[in-house]
């Protein structure tokens, strides 16, 4: 904050020259407020926004993303906001900061706490509202990612791994309550098959799966 002013490029000065100018500012914590003069990078926003707190194993440390995720998100927010401002035809200042950009990624977690007092815990690669949802190792040492966000898909996956007749896993709440048991069964099922076999069986069952690729793939 204040860099434009120190350079003599205060938005008020610029707007006197060009009233239609859109000035976009991106900082760690915004132009005002108690944190405005603090140094801030992606790491700080990932920590303060609550993002790191939900990443990692339940009994492990909070994990930071291995890329500058916040920088990418804030850049998209700034680009979108700038386009909207330009389209409006009104000169203005677009004030984007890293932490607010990351808070947008937190989605329902903010009102979940505000309305119900619930704080999402770390679940490794899992998420609270989908079971199973994880990465699993196949017999040939490859990895696949599974998600069952739709009830019909979850039912097909339960049938596929031999748990379809167990009433404990017949609905969402039952699967969530037995997350660890289902994960163990899924891991066993995957470990008995190659990645090619896993992909073929999931495709035949119309269930969602994808190989875990790196850049070389």
Predicted regions located by residue number:
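Aromatic-enriched alpha-helical interface/lid elements that frame and gate functional surfaces
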Residues: 132-209
């Amino acid at each position: 904050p204040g860099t434009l002013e120190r350079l003599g490029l205060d938005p008020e000065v610029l707007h006197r020259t060009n009233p239609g100018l859109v000035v976009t500012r991106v900082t760690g914590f915004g132009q005002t407020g108690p944190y405005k003069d603090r140094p801030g990078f992606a790491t700080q926003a990932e920590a303060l926004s609550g993002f790191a707190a939900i990443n990692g194993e339940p009994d492990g440390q909070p994990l930071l993303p291995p890329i500058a995720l916040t920088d990418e998100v804030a850049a998209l927010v700034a680009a979108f906001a700038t386009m909207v401002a330009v389209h409006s035809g009104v000169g203005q200042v677009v004030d984007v900061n890293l932490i607010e950009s990351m808070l947008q990624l937190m989605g329902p977690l903010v009102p979940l706490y505000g309305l119900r007092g619930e704080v999402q815990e770390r679940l490794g690669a899992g998420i609270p509202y989908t079971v199973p949802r994880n990465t699993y190792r196949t017999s040939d040492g490859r990895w696949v990612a599974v998600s069952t966000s739709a009830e019909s898909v979850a039912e097909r996956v339960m049938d596929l791994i031999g748990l379809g007749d167990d009433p404990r896993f017949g609905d969402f709440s039952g699967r969530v309550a037995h997350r660890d048991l289902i994960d163990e069964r899924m891991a066993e099922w995957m470990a008995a098959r190659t990645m090619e076999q896993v992909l073929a069986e999931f495709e035949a069952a119309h269930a969602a799966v994808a190989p875990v690729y790196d850049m070389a793939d």
